[in-house]
């Protein structure tokens, strides 16, 4: 074979090998960096742009797609210890002609974390209202979506600021009072009584604990490689002390049942979505809400746990689109 041809293959092979080796090295040595790159790439692919808004010296980080139009804008609030990118799996299946805004909740990701911040549910509601006013999102009423802790905040927000919200989607929200505790809540109470706050199941610090948390939150058993579990833990560990502080704040007497205490004040059309096999917050919470919110509808998803957004993103997006179409008399075809 001609020497130039051999050299060409060597150069081509080396050129291809460099990114492959870089990827393998990242996967093995810096899995957390790979996870960040993954979210960055996914945001770009879906057309989500990251921006910052400021209220005095407080910074909010958010991503958005689209512009306000004749359809309601959609504001999405994530759950405890998550971030705005958790919604990307749902955004993928939402129409591109909708104005979507996903914000990092107080203290999370790119939003300001302050030791002076009021992390109670009502405190978070007031912060989100500041964000809404920064963006002038309430220039006309918007659709509000929240899951878990974000659902807790969303429900109380709709009660506190009814003129801001035209409709509401609550995805397995926290903040309700049940007649009996499920095993997860019983375990939390035992930890609380023993003051073992280092062992909160929703705040993993090892790959094994991360795997246990994923099993707790999901009905579907995802097979997650050890390196990815390590990466997920590495991303969270620097923030775990904040997560503990936040967790203790939202489960104390001041905040624990804020949604329950305010649900009868919610007057906008409300959609309640819950995974039937939710091990974190029992699915019976859907009936509790439906009995107090007169203009509500319940969607219970079979074979689905607490992580509805991650387990059933396509179904969640369809339910939201159908709900908006029915509530706002919009042709469903135009939303798709």
From Swiss-Prot:
Residues 30-336 are cytoplasmic. Its main location: membrane. Keywords: Endosome, Hydrolase, Lipid metabolism, Lysosome, Membrane, Mitochondrion, Signal-anchor, Transmembrane, Transmembrane helix. Optimum pH is 7.5-8.0. The keyword Calcium does not apply. One of its GO terms (molecular function) is phospholipase activity. Widely expressed with higher expression in small intestine, liver and brown adipose tissue. In brain, expressed postsynaptically in cortical neurons but not detected in microglia (at protein level). It catalyses: Hydrolyzes glycerol monoesters of long-chain fatty acids; 2-(5Z,8Z,11Z,14Z-eicosatetraenoyl)-glycerol + H2O = glycerol + (5Z,8Z,11Z,14Z)-eicosatetraenoate + H(+); 1-octanoylglycerol + H2O = octanoate + glycerol + H(+); 1-decanoylglycerol + H2O = decanoate + glycerol + H(+). Residues 1-8 are extracellular. InterPro entries: AB_hydrolase_1 (IPR000073), AB_hydrolase_fold (IPR029058), AB_hydrolase_sf (IPR050266), Epox_hydrolase-like (IPR000639). Disruption phenotype: Abhd6 partial knockdown inducing a stronger depletion in liver, kidney and white adipose tissues protects mice against hight-fat diet-induced metabolic disorder and obesity. De novo lipogenesis in liver is reduced and associated with a reduced expression of lipogenic genes. Accumulation of phospholipids and lysophospholipds in the liver is also observed. Its EC number is 3.1.1.23. It is an enzyme of class 3 (hydrolase). It comes from the Eukaryota. One of its GO terms (biological process) is regulation of retrograde trans-synaptic signaling by endocanabinoid. One of its GO terms (cellular component) is GABA-ergic synapse. It is a single-pass type II membrane protein. The chain crosses the membrane at residues 9-29. The keyword Acyltransferase does not apply. Belongs to the AB hydrolase superfamily. PANTHER family: MONOACYLGLYCEROL LIPASE, MONOACYLGLYCEROL LIPASE ABHD6. This is Monoacylglycerol lipase ABHD6. It comes from Mus musculus.
